[in-house]
């Protein structure tokens, strides 16, 4: 499995400038109140209509250097070439398109019946073909690492270690369990499950905590989104330092750009970062975003130009709502948001089960 990560990193480094340019940040103006009118002001324009399922099966990234995108805009399919030029796709018949009916280079999209990492769709023009290089909509197509030694052994070793000290002073920790604030918060804690990049649980409990000011800000975000028909689905929040150490030790050298350095700690370790998405209040189901949670591909960029209009709209709505209450997005991960006061808190290393027992968390710090 490590080879998949290595291959993917090479693709990221070779990402064309047109995609990188399209992913530059575009910041939203904060909103202040949770009234219906204020909630409406968070909307990133009119809500687009969804697209046919067959379109979603082919919309994505193609080419080993991520040189081609198929995307949807205004209920039309577009082909974006390696120079960043968008061309509208005109259907000829099943799986066949052209960009110019008068002088048609035929674009063929092959969609296998069984989609797997070794059997992916490909796009062909003349004698050139580009395989699809993102995991589509299936979390089973993630890139994984196979740590040696296994996660259980890495956890045993990490729990014996002490986080690095930092100059203080810091605020006293006040970790708050998010779901206790409102039933509108739902949990899907991936690192307490097997469907994560390690293919193994790292947490012993599926719980989510944040420092109280951050948790209360997140509650205000939820109250702004609820009138619009959305709730918040939490994937991760406070992360004990030993888990960051596990991630670091489990990841091969070429993959460490995707994980936090335990010698520096992370915003998750401070209880001031949260990984989350939207869910539909009517169905209870997560909404579709341009990419999947924890996906190691350009679809994770906060301003990735691909996907469908509705997927981008949902992603931008989440960002606008979070930024309105003092959170900032990680530009490489549309789901990751940091609270504005994170520098005021030190690194914590209290496991979830000890928080439940009332163990007071302490930052590992010293005064200068």
Task: Please annotate each region the language model reported.
Residues 2-13:
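Bacterial N-terminal signal peptides that target proteins for export
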Residues 6-7, 32-35, 362-367:
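Intrinsic disorder/low-complexity segments
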Residues 12-25:
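Bacterial N-terminal signal peptides
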Residues 28-152:
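Peripheral terminal and inter-domain segments
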Residues 57-68, 322-326, 333, 338:
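K/E-rich alpha-helical interaction surfaces of small helical-bundle regulatory domains
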Residues 83, 93, 103, 191-193, ...:
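A mature extracytoplasmic/lumenal domain signature
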Residues 140-235, 250-332, 341-368:
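Extracytoplasmic cell-surface/polysaccharide-interacting catalytic and binding patches
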Residues 241-247, 337-344:
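Beta-rich nucleic-acid/ligand-interaction surfaces
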